[in-house]
Regions:
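Transmembrane beta-strands of outer-membrane beta-barrel pores
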Residues: 82-86, 99-101, 110-114, 151-157, ...
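Short strand-turn segments of transmembrane beta-barrel domains in outer membranes
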Residues: 24-97, 122-126
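Membrane-embedded beta-barrel scaffold of Gram-negative outer-membrane proteins
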Residues: 102, 191-206, 357, 363-369, ...
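Signature of Gram-negative outer-membrane beta-barrel scaffolds
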Residues: 245-247, 251-363, 367, 374-375, ...
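Flexible loop and strand-edge segments within Gram-negative outer membrane beta-barrel domains
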Residues: 113, 144-191, 195-227, 258-261, ...
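Gram-negative outer-membrane beta-barrel transporters
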Residues: 290-297, 306, 427, 433-443, ...
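Outer-membrane beta-barrel domain signature, especially the mid-to-C-terminal portions
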Residues: 122-125, 164-167, 203-208, 258, ...
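Transmembrane beta-barrel wall of Gram-negative outer-membrane proteins
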Residues: 83-112, 121-157, 168-190, 236-241, ...
Length: 625
């Protein structure tokens, strides 16, 4: 299944292929509102940048930094990185080595985020402590074989969640990843094999990191998940055509239980996920055809099948003389149907794209696809009874989404463009680039969270969270431009817009990004000691005038936010590609603002608004030897 935040590749060696594979994948689309831990930290994760804050906006690009000359220098195997600021600190030790037949890497890291104040001086009880290790070993016996094995341990402790009713006091993941390439290194006649296993252990409660109100119950949630993915694909090139065929299998076991603390100890009062065992099969075929050097078409077909067995769906909970309904009883009450036996959903996907490159400075692409998205466990198997709109009852009878999607993209470059901030052959006037993209997605059976109000197919009217299939429209557009103003000074900008509509209920979709704009100005130059750069960026977000904020007519997830603008400063210097210092100031003018939050590990179904941090200063360094 998907879970890109849960199951990242150990991206240490180069990817096996440049071409995108599985063009008609069922994993292309994510839920409108997602729940998953943050990405695992790999050697490619930027350090020395500001410490991640869950409640600030995500940048549209990585700020340029000459410190990358140090962090990407592989001629010296050992690297130490650290940063500190008024929000917290982070440290990493990374060792990389490559020989004629062997290559490997190990790393250890720690991150700590403190409570902080927002721009008005109000304290926000957020923060976490995170640590982990990674080890990877690769073996290349000859040009036609490559094998790689990697292990990651990632642990997050005391993750305060002010937007949520509970705090994630423990999240631990163990990820084991194995890869094999058999055949040509350029993927012209090659078999690729991948095996990946993850163990997730998570505990959340409402009492360790916050004060529980008198007479309020003290509760905790314990989550265990085990997932194994096996993938095999074959890729072949003949003339100007390439084909990929692949088969994937996934096994997922997911159990989550809610407990109330009583004088007799912790007693279960509900299952969030009642021991779900899923088998996922995915078969795909892709084909690429270079008609001429300027024209390429590509297409793909896929078949996706997901079977889920909820082992404890008929197991009720009990505390003393108080009985709590089994998951199947809840599903019967809300949807009029219990889940008998296993639940299987399947679908076919198709994708077609045409790319036109009239010159090396222009590229145009149009793509159309019709793909499914399978329902995820929170959407269909959650079984948490509650009162006053605090219950959450998934819908086990959800259908897969059907996305009918068209996308357009174009890139134009001047004759002097080499990269951002770099000029080709001294052609300053031609050192520019424009990128634009737009997409339109008409979704049949879109899976939406909602509240029980006796809608068609809903048998309760108590305001608890439910899931439904509706029709929806999603539209997105963005345009970006970059220009070198001199051999040292460059500027760039990006504007992004999203639109979402629940067509069945004639209301705005929840959790849709408002109009945003980003502008940056960057200076880079050489000095006797090495090189340095300075930069400033402005981020603007429009007020969220389209939102789902009324719990009596919709989900009520969104809260009104005003438009805002914030300015960040940053810079770095490095000497001899060996030692670098980075520094910066975020939220320079100390504005209080609420950012659109697209990080799934902060998702809450009944969220409280959380402001971004006040003005923050950070200083980092890295050193390799």
């Amino acid at each position: 299944m998907k879970l890109p935040y849960l199951l990242p590749l150990l991206a240490v060696a180069a990817a096996h292929a440049e071409e995108k594979t599985d063009l008609a994948t069922a994993d292309a689309y994510r839920p409108q509102y997602d729940f998953s831990p943050p990405p695992v930290i790999t050697p490619q994760t930027p350090f020395g940048q500001p410490l991640e804050n869950q409640f600030d906006y995500q940048r549209p690009w990585v700020n340029p930094s000459v410190a990358q000359n140090v962090s990407t220098n592989t001629t010296r195997p050992l690297q130490i990185e650290a940063s500190i600021g008024n929000l917290g600190d982070q440290e990493r030790l990374l060792y990389r080595q490559r020989g004629s037949n062997l290559y490997g890497a190990v790393q250890a890291y720690r991150l700590h985020l403190d409570d902080y104040k927002d721009g008005s001086g109000q304290r926000v009880h957020a923060g976490y402590t995170r640590d982990g290790e990674m080890a990877m070993l690769g073996f290349v016996p000859d040009a036609r074989q490559e094998y790689r094995l990697g292990v990651v341990r990632d642990h997050i402790a005391d993750d305060k969640q002010p937007q949520h009713q509970m705090d994630a006091v423990k999240t631990q993941r163990i990820v084991v990843n194995a890869n094999a390439r058999l055949g040509a290194q350029d993927q012209s006649n090659t078999i690729n094999l991948t095996a990946r296993h993850i163990e997730l252990d998570r505990t959340a409660n409402n009492y360790k990191l916050r004060t529980t109100a008198p007479n309020s119950p003290r509760v905790k949630m314990e989550v265990e998940r085990s997932k194994t993915d096996l993938n095999a694909d074959y890729r072949i090139q003949y003339g100007e055509q390439r084909s990929h065929i692949g088969l994937q299998y996934g096994r997922d076991s997911h159990n989550a239980e809610r407990f109330a603390l009583t004088p007799q100890g912790a007693r279960r009062n509900a299952y969030r996920f009642a021991d779900i065992h899923s088998d996922h099969y995915h078969l795909y075929y892709d084909h690429y055809w270079n008609l001429t050097p300027e024209h390429q078409i590509s297409g793909g077909l896929s078949y996706d099948r997901l079977t889920a067995d909820v082992k404890k769906k008929n197991t009720p909970s009990k505390i003393g003389e108080q009985n709590f309904p089994a998951p199947n009883q809840l599903w019967q009450q809300y949807y009029g149907r219990a889940l008998n036996g296993k639940r299987t959903t399947s679908g076919v996907g198709a994708a077609l794209a045409y790319e036109f490159r009239p010159s090396e400075r222009q590229k145009y692409r149009i793509g159309v696809d019709s793909r499914i998205r399978q329902p995820e466990n929170p959407e269909r198997f959650t079984s948490l009874p509650g009162q006053n709109g605090m219950g959450w009852i998934g819908n086990p009878h959800l259908k897969p989404e059907r996305h009918n999607h068209i996308s357009l993209a174009a890139t134009w470059q001047g004759t002097g463009w080499r990269d951002y901030g770099k000029v080709r052959n001294g052609d300053l006037a031609g050192a520019w680039q424009i990128e634009a993209a737009a997409d339109y997605d008409k979704v049949h059976d879109f899976i939406t969270y909602d509240r029980a109000r006796g809608q068609n197919g809903i048998h309760k009217n108590d305001g608890n969270i439910i899931s439904r299939n509706v029709d929806a429209t999603l539209i997105g557009a963005e345009i970006g431009a970059a220009k070198s103003l001199s051999t040292n000074l460059a500027a760039r900008s990006k504007i992004r817009y999203q639109y979402g509509e629940n067509d069945s209920d004639n209301r705005a979709l929840y959790h849709v990004r408002p109009l945003t704009a980003d502008i940056a100005l960057d200076w880079r130059d050489y000095a006797p000691f090495g090189s340095y750069n300075l930069g400033v960026n402005l981020h603007y977000a429009h007020k969220n005038s389209r939102r789902d904020s009324n719990k009596t007519t919709g989900l009520g997830l969104d809260y009104p936010t005003a438009g805002y603008a914030t300015v960040n400063l940053y810079g770095s210097l490095q000497t001899r590609d060996r030692f670098a210092i980075t520094l910066g100031v975020n939220n320079l003018f100390n504005r209080r603002y609420f950012a659109y939050n697209e990080q799934p590990h902060t998702a809450a179904i009944n969220p409280n608004p959380v402001a971004a941090p006040e003005r923050s200063v950070w200083l980092g360094f890295n050193y390799n030897f």
